C-alpha cells in the first residue's frame, strides 16, 4: 500500500457521495503498514471494510509459510483508531491445514480475534498449482492426505457436456488428524453463522458478560449435536454427510463422476447444494430456528447451573434475546 492510495480512496468516496456508486469497495489490505492502512481507510469512510488477515498466530506456522503478521498490539491499536471515525467493522482471516497448525492453536487464534471483536473468516487450505505448498517436497513434508471438492458455483453445461471445476484441499497433516478437520469443519459453520454473520451475535455477547466465551459455546454445541437424536442432531448428521461425501473425493475424476450423476447434478441446478456454511445457515434459519433456539436454551440452562446463577431468570433473559436474533 502506498501513500497515494489514500488519494485514490478519497476520489472513490467522492464518486460514491455524488452518484451512490460504488456502494461498497472490496480491498485487499497490506499486512505490514498499519499507518498507511489507517490513512487510506479514513478516506474510504464506511464503504470499505478493513481487514487484518493473519492466517495463523503460531510462529512456526508463519515461519514455514514465510509470512510476517501484524502483532496483536498493532491490530488492537488499528481497531481503536478505526473506531474513532465510525469504522466498527473489521475482519481477519485464518486458514486451517497450514504446516504445524494444530486444532488447539487454530481455535485459540479464533478466540483472540473474537476477543478483539473481529469478524473472522476461516478457510481450508487448498493447494494451488505452482505454489510452494503444492511442490512435491512440501506435500511429503507436511501433508498426509488431500481431497477434492467442487469450487462454489463452478459448473455448467457447454455443448451438451457437464463441465466442473474442483479444488484440492488438505484433509490431514502431521499435526491435524482427519477427525480434527471434521470437527473444525462444523465449528467453522457455527462460528460463521452465529458470530461473523451475526445471526446469534447478541446472544453470544450476552453470554460473554458471564465469562462464557463464544468458543466455549461452539464447542458445547458440537458436543451436544453428536449426542442429540432430535432435529438438530439430524441436521448435524446431514451436514457431516455432505462434507464426507462431497468435500473429500480422492481424485478430481471421482468428483466429476459423482457430480455428473443426474440426481447429484440436479442438486446443483436447483440450488440444493453450495458452500456448506451458507447452505446450512439458510437451512437452520428457515427450517430449524425454533428447534435450535430450544437447543441453545438447554445449553444456557447448563451454564447457569454450573455458574450458580438464578437459572430461571438467566434462561428467561436468553429466551428474550433469542426472540430478536
Predicted regions and their residues:
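Conserved SAM/AdoMet-binding glycine-rich loop
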Residues: 1-91, 96-98
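Flexible glycine/acidic-rich beta-alpha junction loops that bind and position SAM and/or redox cofactors
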Residues: 3-5, 55, 60-66, 96-105, ...
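Short, electropositive alpha-helical surface patch
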Residues: 6-17, 102-117, 182-188
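Extended interaction regions within the primary functional domain
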Residues: 11-26, 37-47, 52, 117-119, ...
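Hydrophobic, Leu/Ile/Phe/Ala-enriched alpha-helical segments that form helix-helix packing faces
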Residues: 12-16, 41, 79-82, 113, ...
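A generic secondary-structure signal for well-formed alpha-helical elements
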Residues: 16, 86, 117-120, 124, ...
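Short alpha-helical segments and helix-capping/turn motifs at coil-helix boundaries
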Residues: 35-37, 106-108, 171
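Radical SAM enzyme core and accessory elements
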Residues: 168-325
Amino acid at each position: 500500500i502506498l501513500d497515494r492510495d489514500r488519494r485514490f480512496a478519497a476520489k472513490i468516496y467522492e464518486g460514491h457521495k455524488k452518484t451512490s456508486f460504488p456502494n461498497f469497495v472490496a480491498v485487499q489490505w497490506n499486512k505490514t503498514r498499519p499507518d498507511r492502512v489507517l490513512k487510506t481507510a479514513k478516506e474510504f469512510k464506511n464503504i470499505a471494510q478493513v481487514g487484518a488477515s493473519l492466517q495463523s498466530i503460531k510462529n512456526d506456522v508463519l515461519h514455514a509459510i514465510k509470512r510476517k503478521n501484524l502483532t496483536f498490539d498493532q491490530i488492537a491499536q488499528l481497531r481503536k483508531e478505526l473506531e474513532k471515525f465510525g469504522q466498527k467493522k473489521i475482519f481477519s482471516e485464518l486458514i486451517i491445514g497450514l504446516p504445524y497448525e494444530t486444532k488447539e492453536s487454530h481455535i485459540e487464534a479464533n478466540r483472540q480475534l473474537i476477543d478483539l471483536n473481529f469478524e473472522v473468516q476461516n478457510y481450508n487450505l487448498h493447494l494451488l498449482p505452482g505454489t510452494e505448498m503444492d511442490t512435491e517436497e512440501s506435500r511429503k513434508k507436511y501433508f498426509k492426505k488431500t481431497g477434492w471438492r467442487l469450487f462454489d458455483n463452478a459448473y455448467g453445461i457447454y455443448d451438451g457436456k457437464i463441465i466442473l471445476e474442483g479444488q484440492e484441499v488438505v484433509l490431514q497433516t502431521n499435526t491435524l488428524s482427519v477427525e480434527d478437520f471434521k470437527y473444525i469443519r462444523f465449528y467453522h459453520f457455527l462460528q460463521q453463522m452465529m458470530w461473523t454473520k451475526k445471526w446469534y451475535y447478541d446472544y453470544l455477547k450476552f453470554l460473554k458478560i458471564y465469562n462464557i466465551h463464544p468458543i466455549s459455546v461452539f464447542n458445547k454445541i458440537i458436543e451436544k449435536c453428536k449426542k442429540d437424536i432430535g432435529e438438530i442432531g439430524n441436521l448435524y448428521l446431514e451436514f457431516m454427510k455432505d462434507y464426507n461425501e462431497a468435500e473429500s473425493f480422492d481424485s478430481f475424476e471421482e468428483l466429476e463422476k459423482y457430480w455428473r450423476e443426474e440426481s447429484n447434478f440436479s442438486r446443483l441446478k436447483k440450488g440444493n447444494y453450495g458452500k456448506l456454511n451458507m447452505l446450512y445457515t439458510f437451512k437452520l434459519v428457515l427450517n430449524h430456528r425454533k428447534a435450535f433456539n430450544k437447543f441453545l436454551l438447554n445449553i444456557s440452562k447448563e451454564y447457569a447451573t454450573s455458574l450458580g446463577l438464578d437459572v430461571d431468570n438467566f434462561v428467561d433473559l436468553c429466551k428474550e434475546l433469542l426472540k430478536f436474533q
